[in-house]
Structures are given as structure tokens and as C-alpha cells.
Amino acid sequence: MPETADQNARAPLAGSADPARTPTSPAPHSPGAAPMREMKADLVVIGAGSAGLSAAAGAAQFGLSVVLYEKGEMGGDCLNTGCVPSKALLSAAKAAAQIREAGKFGIETTPPRVDWEKVKLHVRTAIATIAPVDSQERFEGLGCTVIREHAKFAAPDTIISPSTRVKARRIVIATGSRAFIPPIEGLAKIPYLTNETLFDLPDFPEHLVILGGGPIGMEMAQAFVRLGAKITVIEMDKALGRSDRAHAEIAIETLRAEGVTILEGYKATKVEQEGQTIRIHTEPKDGAAWIVEGSHLLVAVGRQTVFDGMDLEKGDVDHDRKGILVGDTLRSRSNRRVWALGDAAGREQFTHIAGWHASVFARRAFFKQRTTADSLPVPAVTYTSPEIAQLGLTEAEARKQHGDDITTPSFRFEESDRAIAEADTEGEVKLIVRKGKLLGASIIGKDAGDLIQLVSVAMSNGLGVKELTNFISPYPTRAEGVKRAANAHYADVVFGKSAKRLVGLLQRIP
């Protein structure tokens, strides 16, 4: 079936709800007030982020009664403190960078002046523009009962909040994640930043030190250096360690060229503050210790799931530090009424994965299909300039599994007419192929996150590298690079000695 639940959270507003099946949201419960309201629902969803909203919207539009709990902001981390504000900030930073680089096109400019308050206004405007799609009013219009309270288990089939007790046929836990704070000496004593506080900084940071060289850390490093801050990134291992290594190095060198200091193989051991200066002590894997001083510290070393005060044990819901214990069906192994979606499932922590999980839930719970969370390859994008897009196995992972029985046909954007015209030729398309089967792809360059979708469609539908050669790509586009990388896989066959002999023989035919 189509991916209905994944789309519903951002679908146009549906018709009015059926009053016969839609309970009303109760008033908050307090001592001396009316007794706690008792309700029954086909589905209780805890968490109004991407996964929870998609699951709730889909179920409501299928005609089921839905209670949606959210104690914080509707839209969750992605809308309010994650994907949307970070990409809005990156867009502002990109505009500043383009002004500085306009000279290569023969356009003379003056250095851009950054107004931090107006940059933050741009970020807030992006959030506010999208917010109605995720709003309480919209979901009440779809037929959901939205309760803005903390929810917890009272029994395996019962969820309670200060005002309401709901007995549910099915329960979805979609509570997301928050920044992981490492146990570094002195860290708790200083006003460090996370993604939840970064975008509301009252003053622009003079020197932002970032703990963590993953996608979030590197994206914010580039954003703030382009806006005029001094940046130091401290990474215990390799920056962008989950990306194709060669592509990661291209991005790392680009950031260094823009002025970002990146310390790889350095572990932060102690943090202290003296006046307005934050001091981070580090220990390297090799070499001398380094003390980094800055005005602000951003912690971006990873994420941890959020189950605070949910009384999961009362719901017979087993979990570990990564998330609810589920299989590839996303159903709790200990309580069959419960499903975990998005970050709560302890798998890849992407908004698009959360939406996919909601689709898997809808297909399995409502239509009894056999779709699993692992049935499609997962694309991942780091939104630096150049972007890095990854799908399936990296080259290193493929060689570890299959040895030399793989090929890596590629196409460099320095050969792309569109990239040349745009004076932006950094990067390449690399396919990972084994016996004609696509095992993965990595793309680095402008719009890599859009280009990877061609390969994602192919891999998701069982198509091989051959099918990526068999379509007409408009000229001039960067997307041609995917087709030309696929063509490169067959270069020796098409233009080799055997082909030449065959063509020679065929030319003898009148």
C-alpha cells in the first residue's frame, strides 16, 4: 500500500471528525477538582514529533479513536530545536558565504554584515511557518484528542496523566531523544549549549567550541564560522566517522579551509570557566595535551532516548539505554500492545526514519501487512557544504563483507557541465556494486541529499546498477552524475576489446 501514515502528518487538512468516536480533551486535573476522566481509545500515542504525529494522523483518518499526548512543543525536536532551525541557520550562513564568493563570477561586493537578531528571526519564521501543520488545532481537526500533559503507564494497557486515564487497544511510544551529556569533569557546572538552547543565544558567540564531530557538530561549525564566529571542533575519533572516509575528508578539509579548527583524536577530560572564558582540557590519542579556550561550548556528542517518568515497568515494557526492546516489526517484545517508533525504537535517529516507522506501524497494525522497519535502505545526509549523502553500505563496509568482489564506479563533478557552469565542482558520485547489485552509494557535493534519492528509489525497488543507466537524464543537471557513475560500471564491457570485435563483425552485415 502507499506510505499513507508517513504522509498524513503533513497532508492537507482532512474533513471534520466524527463526533460519535471523538472524545473531547479534558480540563487539567487538580486536587479538589472533578475525578480523573476515564477514556477508551483505539490508539494512544505518546509524543508529538514526526513519528507520533504521522501515526496519530494516519489512525485518525482511518476512522480510529486516537489520544495524542505531548507535554512539550507540538512538532517535537525536529521542528523546534533540530532539523528545521538548523537548516534555516545553515541557509543564512550559506547566503553570507555566497556573498563572499561572488567575486569569482565577476560580481564585486562588500563583506556581509551579520545581524544575529535578524538571523534568529529567520530561524523562528521558518519554525512558525511549518508549525500549523503540526499544531494541536490541526490534529484536533483530524479527530485526535490532544492532551498536553506528561503521560505514563498505569498498567500494560493503560496510560494516565494528571487529568486523564486512557485504556488503549494499542499504544505508540514516540518520545524521541535529547542531547547526550557526557560525564566530563566540571561540565555540569558551566552553561553549556545543546541543540535545545543554541538557536536562542542572546549574543552571537565570539568563539564557539563544539564537542563532537558528527553531522550536528560539523553542520553547526560551518554555519557559525560563515556567520563570523571562531570555531573549534573536538572529536574523540574521526570527524564524520560514519560517512565514506574519502568523502568525509573532503568535507573536513573544506571546513578547515573556511577557518574551522578540527581536533581529531582528542578527548575532552575537564571543563572549567573563568569569567567569560570556558576552558576545555583535552587528551590526544597521540601527542601533547591541548587546552582549548572559548566563549561558548556546544555539546553535540550524540543523542539518548527519553523515557523519563513513564513508568515503563508498570506497562511491562522492556527497554535498555538505546530504546524500547523491539524487533524489526517495531513491536515491544514484552508487551504486544506497545509499539516504539522513531528514536524510541533504538535505531537510526533520523526524522525520515521516524516517518517510515509510522508507516510500518500503520501497515502492520491496521492492514496486517508484513512490512518491517528494515525492509528499505536508509539514506543519511550531512548538510555541510559540500553535502554528504550516504545509502546502504560504504565502500569500507562492503569490502569488509565481500572483499575485492565489489566495484566502485564513480563520476566526479569536475566533469559535470552543470557544476562547471556553477563554478562548484567539488565532489563525486560513488556507487557500491557487487555483480550488478547496488549495495550502497555515497555522494559528496552540492545537493547530494537530493541526488541520493535516485539510488534510493532503485535500491528500494530491487533495481540494479543497469537500471540506473536506462533513463533519459535532462541536460545539464547534477543528477546526470548518478547515471554517468552507473555507465562507468559498464565502460570496460561496452568499449572493451570484445565489444570492438563484435561491432567490427556487425559492420560486415549489409
Each language-model region and where it sits:
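Glycine-rich dinucleotide-binding loop and its adjacent helix/turn
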Residues: 83, 175-234, 258-261, 313-334
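A structured beta-alpha segment of the ubiquitous adenosine-cofactor-binding alpha/beta core
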Residues: 162-164, 268, 281-291, 303
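Flexible, glycine-rich terminal cap/loop adjacent to redox cofactors
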Residues: 46-72, 77, 84, 88-95, ...
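FAD-site-proximal beta/loop scaffold in flavoenzymes
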Residues: 188-204, 291-367, 454, 469
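Beta1/beta-strand and adjacent pyrophosphate-binding region of the FAD-binding site
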Residues: 37-51, 204-211
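Short hydrophobic core segments
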Residues: 44-46, 151, 166-176, 211, ...
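Glycine-rich flavin
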Residues: 2-7, 12-41, 57-64, 69-204, ...
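Conserved phosphate-binding and hydrolysis motifs of nucleotide-dependent enzymes
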Residues: 47-52, 176, 212-217, 302, ...
